[in-house]
């Protein structure tokens, strides 16, 4: 599926918490995700340290912070997509805020992720950036099936086409 008039052309993938993206055990999923993003007409750019593995990512929060800063600096990247959640994104904070570098380089780009990424949503909100609490690369776009879940695909496509998502009103359950 090649989408005409898409808002997002290049997705930058970051590993801000868990480094599983670099492990051999998930490379078949990574391949599926890359193929899906390309079918949507998107270019995929993995940030420099995003695929270094669990140990490296855990031991180097400064490199994770560097990847996020570089994703904002890179004008070819339209959307920043988190690889997956995790449990230690808070370790990036000193590397992002102690010298104000993130504040100096941040500009409006779609930022998408969930779970431990909530910390990133909060810090970007504090800098005036609108973010989307939603899909991650591994958990949603690399879904191990013939296609993505229809609900997930619908809202992801809406985001890359328009740069926004219409308000979703859930139907009430009748119990």
Question: Each predicted region: which residue ranges?
Answer:
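Short, acidic/small-residue loops that bind anionic groups at enzyme active sites
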Residues: 98-123, 130-137
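Flexible, glycine/proline-enriched loop segments at strand-loop-helix junctions
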Residues: 19-23, 107-111, 137-147
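Gly/Ser/Thr-rich loops at beta-strand to alpha-helix junctions
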Residues: 17-21, 84-89, 112-119
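Long, hydrophobic/aromatic-enriched structural stretches that serve as scaffold segments
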Residues: 71-97
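ATP/NTP phosphate-donor binding region
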Residues: 1-76
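Short glycine-/acidic-enriched loop or helix-start segments at secondary-structure transitions
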Residues: 23, 89-92, 122-123, 143
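Conserved anion/nucleotide-ligand pocket segment
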Residues: 130-175
């Amino acid at each position: 599926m090649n989408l005409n008039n898409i808002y997002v052309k290049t997705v930058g993938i970051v590993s801000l918490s868990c480094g599983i993206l670099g492990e051999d055990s998930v490379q078949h999923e990574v391949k599926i995700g890359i193929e899906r993003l390309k079918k949507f007409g998107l270019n995929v750019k993995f940030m420099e340290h995003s695929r270094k593995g669990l140990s490296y990512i855990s031991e180097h929060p400064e490199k994770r912070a560097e990847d996020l800063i570089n994703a904002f600096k890179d004008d070819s990247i339209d959307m920043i997509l988190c690889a997956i959640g995790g449990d230690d994104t808070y370790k990036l904070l000193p590397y992002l805020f102690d010298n104000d570098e993130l504040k100096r380089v941040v500009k409006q780009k779609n930022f998408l992720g969930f779970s431990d990424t909530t910390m990133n949503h909060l810090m970007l909100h504090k800098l005036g950036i609108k973010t989307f609490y939603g899909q991650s690369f591994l958990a949603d776009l690399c879904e191990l099936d013939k296609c993505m879940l229809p609900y997930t695909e619908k809202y992801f496509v809406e985001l890359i086409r328009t740069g926004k998502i219409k308000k979703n009103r859930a139907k009430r359950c009748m119990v």
